[in-house]
Amino acid sequence: GLIVTNGDQTDTVWEYLAKGESWEAALRTRQFEDDAPNWTPRISGLQAGDGSYKLSILKSADPEGMACARFFYEYPAVPGLGHFLHTYVCDGNPVIPTFQGEPERVSIPADIDDFTRELWENLNPDNKISLFVRYTDLETRKYQQRILNKHSK
């Protein structure tokens, strides 16, 4: 499988899975980032060997950051279809509003470079940091991947 996150919860997920415990159990030990007043959500993704995948977002359940709301989603592998979670809805002042609702459905074109470019160009330039895109042939297990980072040349 493949684990992708926007924080150090990657290690927690890896450790739990290595012990035979669940992804959900791992993420129940974690919460949003302690960066009041925004309480940055923690987003995680896990792809299984058959191409199915899970997504999670951990966010503050209240403006004071006193409780964590945990959302888990599971999807089968459907060629050309994926789901997208992001940290924030838009800019905010003084508080940035966090993502709301279910993960967004996205069409995935056959060309990885076209898809990578489309995703990167549609991320807010002031907020984007990095992007990881991987295409995997489920029969041969061969994959292509792209990693973009706004701080790399």
Protein language model annotation of sequence segments:
Residues G1-K153:
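Conserved short alpha-helical segments that host acidic/polar catalytic motifs at enzyme active sites
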